[in-house]
């Protein structure tokens, strides 16, 4: 599996270097250390199995994540009382690069987030600045002080420190990269709209 994780890392480096918004947000560290993390294959991640990407530019990354999915340390962060059972059945993420990721670094965090169709990722915030980059599917991105936007593959969305934001999927799933460039230990908090 290590080779496949390295392939994923290399494909993401290539995507990053070819996207001005991503490369201006933060540089990806060159000194990542592979970390063999205990897999945690959660139910929502299994929904990736039969999902085909239609974006030629990101298809390779999508397909590698699909192949690796059973070997990834998927997480959910939230409790049912805060976000509801329905949300948790359609949501998962993992840290690919970061202090506890599949590749270790303290310079930034890079997460992969999966949202199934017909899902609402409630309003939340955190101290870390972040940028979303959609790999597959689409979602409606909303944030306080900004216009909402439907993001499709190759599109980005920046969130300032403590800026409340939410995501909604409709008839499509959404697979995204999410980078934090500072405050890597930020707590994610659900906020009232």
Model regions: which residues?
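A short, N-terminal "cap"/entry segment at the start of jelly-roll beta-barrel domains
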Residues: 5-106
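Short acidic-glycine-tyrosine-enriched beta hairpin
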Residues: 145-164
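Short beta-turn/strand-loop junction motif enriched in small, turn-promoting residues
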Residues: 99-101, 119-120, 163-164
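Short, conserved beta-strand element in jelly-roll/cupin
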Residues: 112-118, 125-141
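A short hydrophobic beta-strand segment most commonly corresponding to one strand
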Residues: 131-133, 156-158, 171-191
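Membrane-proximal helix-loop-helix units in multi-pass membrane proteins
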Residues: 108-110
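Short histidine-centered beta-strand/loop micro-motifs
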Residues: 104-105, 121-126, 143, 168
